[in-house]
């Protein structure tokens, strides 16, 4: 079976209402993307919890609709003109769309083929659970099945956190909290590098399912808890040698007092999910408790780190908030 894919190029303000109209006219699915994606003029849009993007679509948005060919009862040649006429009746005067035929595929196999083992630093390998591990006796292999959770190791923010962990020389028996853990990849890596105990938390129940499954696959002792479970691992009096949060700049700032409150005196914090242009603002927020700095930059993203100062330890809030979900 094949599907009919139609791609309309429209202005930002037209994208969402056009998508709704196409669904009303029988589209199986609709996606909106940057028409310049992959090119020089590509314009990233980021939405963070508590902070909406300045615009909701791109100046030139590609609206892609997928149709079942069986909906075309009037013959192939008439389908697009009739669709355009129907759209015109509800206020859309559009040029004919690009058209493609999408063949039915084994979508699971296709998706899996897009993930390959990733080497990070000298020793860490992120290996999809359906791939064989590399033949390297010194490799620290992280078998990951992301499911619906963020964290496959391919994104620069995750990559930076893993690289930070690999380059630390004294992790044995250091306690670590992975805040907003997603697939659990950072917590699992920390456990394999010697951290103990290791705790991961995320507001998303699907992330907990993926993270616990990944911990089992990797034979690692990591505890994953939801923030509303009342776990002692998240109690105000429980502190950690390392607090790691790979979320986004706005929630990192909003949750700064709670994150700092989870740090032991002299403990370290690692913050990722921050664009290079946002680094100064995040650093300013955390400077009331520690002296944060940019540890490393990759593809426009930065990883920040810092150590809790003794004279500022008591200024952090004791209220521990739920981690924000990361959206990509």
UniProtKB/Swiss-Prot annotation:
<dbReference type="GO" id="GO:0032259">
    <property type="term" value="P:methylation"/>
</dbReference>
<dbReference type="GO" id="GO:0016279">
    <property type="term" value="F:protein-lysine N-methyltransferase activity"/>
</dbReference>
<dbReference type="InterPro" id="IPR050078">
    <property type="entry name" value="Ribosomal_L11_MeTrfase_PrmA"/>
</dbReference>
<feature type="binding site">
    <location>
        <position position="246"/>
    </location>
    <ligand>
        <name>S-adenosyl-L-methionine</name>
    </ligand>
</feature>
<dbReference type="GO" id="GO:0005829">
    <property type="term" value="C:cytosol"/>
</dbReference>
<feature type="binding site">
    <location>
        <position position="202"/>
    </location>
    <ligand>
        <name>S-adenosyl-L-methionine</name>
    </ligand>
</feature>
<protein>
    <recommendedName>
        <fullName>Ribosomal protein L11 methyltransferase</fullName>
        <ecNumber>2.1.1.-</ecNumber>
    </recommendedName>
</protein>
<feature type="binding site">
    <location>
        <position position="180"/>
    </location>
    <ligand>
        <name>S-adenosyl-L-methionine</name>
    </ligand>
</feature>
<keyword id="KW-0949">S-adenosyl-L-methionine</keyword>
<dbReference type="Pfam" id="PF06325">
    <property type="entry name" value="PrmA"/>
</dbReference>
<dbReference type="InterPro" id="IPR004498">
    <property type="entry name" value="Ribosomal_PrmA_MeTrfase"/>
</dbReference>
<feature type="binding site">
    <location>
        <position position="158"/>
    </location>
    <ligand>
        <name>S-adenosyl-L-methionine</name>
    </ligand>
</feature>
<keyword id="KW-0963">Cytoplasm</keyword>
<comment type="function">
    <text>Methylates ribosomal protein L11.</text>
</comment>
<keyword id="KW-0489">Methyltransferase</keyword>
<dbReference type="InterPro" id="IPR029063">
    <property type="entry name" value="SAM-dependent_MTases_sf"/>
</dbReference>
<keyword id="KW-0808">Transferase</keyword>
<comment type="similarity">
    <text>Belongs to the methyltransferase superfamily. PrmA family.</text>
</comment>
